[in-house]
């Protein structure tokens, strides 16, 4: 008997997952997509398998806005293991060197300020960045080390939460593209003992925090009790990641033309920048940008 093809649901929204340790971001996405039986899905930037915490997952029309979440600032809590360096900069790598730890709390506190603000980071070899079309982690697994250009990142918070040698727990708030593994390795180098990430938990991704995150266990339990439809309660609106943007509500007349790809005028709109756009009923219909002549040009539209 031929297998009946599963008909996926055309759902739309954002689900904030508390990603479990040991699972890649894509594995987590595909698992939740299967539970929701969703037609279209995407995530908003990878978390290492070692890491846990906030991973916003976009479904349906919300995938059109995932790039803007990818660009958002992030927050983390990380356990820094001093005295040991590894090939990957975290606990999943092979041992490179082991040294005695004579670092005191004051030593660590005094080292932190140099890593706050705008700093330069050299991306790790074990990363998804590409060199001549090849992911760096694949080159690293083949034993290759290639030159990487330093990149500017911003660390807005770097605080010591606890100090229990040889481990220390740090709170980090940072711009996109920041590698906490590299931050910890560089800090270990300054301290003279080396270090790696023993644990990493993302606490914030743009406007989303741990308080909004749902565990995979919860999703599986609710799915077992009520099927895919029971999980819709965890979906947030498509524009949930853009609530810090200005909002513009169009008249019925203007919304009609705007949804057909035509820039429109709106006297109450800001003079520049990006906007969340709503129709006359307050329904989110897409994002727009103010053009040089003051009109609102549609950039990404919600399919009705």
Swiss-Prot record:
GO molecular function terms noted in the UniProt entry: RNA binding; tRNA pseudouridine(55) synthase activity
Family statement: Belongs to the pseudouridine synthase TruB family. Type 1 subfamily.
Name the record gives this protein: tRNA pseudouridine synthase B
Active site: 48 (nucleophile)
Source species: Pseudomonas aeruginosa (strain UCBPP-PA14)
SUPFAM superfamilies: Pseudouridine synthase (SSF55120), PUA domain-like (SSF88697)
General function of this protein: Responsible for synthesis of pseudouridine from uracil-55 in the psi GC loop of transfer RNAs.
Reactions performed catalytically: uridine(55) in tRNA = pseudouridine(55) in tRNA
EC number: 5.4.99.25
InterPro entries in UniProt: PsdUridine_synth_cat_dom_sf, PsdUridine_synth_N, PUA-like_sf, PUA_sf, tRNA_psdUridine_synth_TruB, tRNA_sdUridine_synth_fam1_C, TruB_C
Name of one Pfam family that matches: TruB_N
Keyword Isomerase assigned: yes
